């Protein structure tokens, strides 16, 4: 209710969850990778083969993008936030201070520039089918355009959007309804630039596990009728 009234409080649980997830989990994981993985770091895959230098370079670029992605989300919600570039111990976490929005913006743009400078970051047309959902060059350009708009850098936003359009990797779906009713044409459509990829399991409440908590057992095998003692 505090958020709906435009008066969120520090005790608002939803905001606490967003803060913890973005800063303590997502950004922290990006920092762990950037701190510990270099092109020279020997890494072995599950099958026993070494991870190639090209793949490690791609991981690093993806981590820079994701860190920028989460920092922008934090900045839009909380304005001034602490800039953390490395893993922190318990003591360090108690002494960090917030940076002004201008510094956070510059930090975000720097991360995006690093990602775009990596030649091993592929374009959308270069992705294989099993890589759908990974960061692409067009995803970085699209996101940088969004960040630039919020900073009133309209020239950069226009330039980056044009790069995405000119890539030819995306197009509008003729039938708008297909975005919602067709897995093949909607979920993995040419309109999707960057998205979270989830498994689709029709028998499991048509792919939505939340339904089982709200419907009776006779409908979809849900748990809505369960009453714990």
Cite the ranges covered by each PLM segment.
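A short small-residue
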Residues: 7-11, 88-93
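Conserved, well-structured interaction surfaces
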Residues: 2-78, 99-103, 115-124
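An aromatic- and glycine-enriched ligand-binding surface/loop that stacks and positions planar moieties
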Residues: 1, 81, 105, 109, ...
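Short linear capping/connector segments at secondary-structure termini
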Residues: 46-52, 85-92, 127-129
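All-alpha amphipathic helical-bundle segments outside canonical DNA-binding/catalytic cores
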Residues: 55, 59, 128-135
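Active-site-proximal beta-strand/loop segments in catalytic clefts of secreted hydrolases
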Residues: 37, 86-87, 196-197
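Short coil/turn linking the two alpha-helices of tandem helical-hairpin repeats
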Residues: 75-77, 82-83, 88, 123, ...
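Flexible interdomain linker/hinge and immediately adjacent N-terminus
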Residues: 89-104
């Amino acid at each position: 209710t505090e958020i709906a009234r435009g008066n969120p409080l520090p005790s608002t649980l939803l905001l606490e969850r967003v803060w913890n997830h973005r800063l303590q989990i997502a950004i922290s994981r990006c920092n762990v990778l950037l701190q510990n993985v270099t092109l020279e770091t020997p890494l072995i895959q599950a099958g026993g083969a070494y991870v190639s230098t090209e793949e490690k370079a791609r991981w690093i670029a993806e981590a820079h993008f994701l860190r920028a992605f989460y920092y922008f989300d934090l900045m839009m919600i909380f304005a001034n936030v602490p800039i953390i570039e490395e893993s922190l111990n318990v003591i360090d976490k108690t002494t960090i201070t917030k940076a002004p929005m201008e510094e956070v913006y510059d930090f975000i743009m720097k991360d995006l520039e690093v990602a775009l400078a990596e030649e091993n970051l592929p374009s959308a047309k270069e992705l294989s089918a099993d890589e759908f959902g990974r960061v692409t060059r067009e995803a970085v350009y699209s996101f940088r355009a969004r960040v630039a708009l919020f900073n009133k850098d309209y020239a950069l936003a226009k330039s980056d959007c044009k790069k995405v359009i000119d890539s030819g990797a995306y197009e509008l779906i003729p039938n708008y309804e297909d975005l919602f009713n067709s897995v093949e044409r909607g979920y993995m459509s040419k309109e999707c630039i960057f998205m979270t990829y989830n498994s689709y399991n029709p028998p499991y409440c048509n792919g939505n596990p939340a339904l089982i908590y709200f419907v009776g057992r006779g409908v979809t095998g849900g748990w809505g009728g369960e009453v714990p003692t």
